[in-house]
């Protein structure tokens, strides 16, 4: 059969640079950002005594042996743990998701099924479901609300995932070869993005 979809959600123009920005935003917010070097005088070992007197030696004046100019000295403006996250506007995020959905639909990577209910939360049941539908390993199941049995059955499959429509994002849509959802999920996507 076929399902009617809103053209405003599933027939967007693909803006590659916007999609790239969205993916960069997602990956940047995942970064640990924990690069750090010794920063302050308090972080360093070594004497705080003045190596020689200020005047009269003919050498350059120096205050301590941990000056940044000296070997073994502290790092000036070195990296500190920080967040690399940045934001896109709501409109940009929406347009990027619409673009990827349209691209997936055009590439016939969308499968709509009546139900995604599994009786037992077992991996072999998820494999049987995927094999029965001829789905590739990289499959994303989009569900309108939490489906515990499906989530538990799929979580041990390395490349398949279950995602709530509320968590719909460009990265997950791009990473998976096939998107599987129900008419209820499509309705919820349309409500969210129209």
Task: Please annotate each region the language model reported.
Residues 39-77:
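Glycine/serine-rich anion-binding loops at beta->alpha junctions
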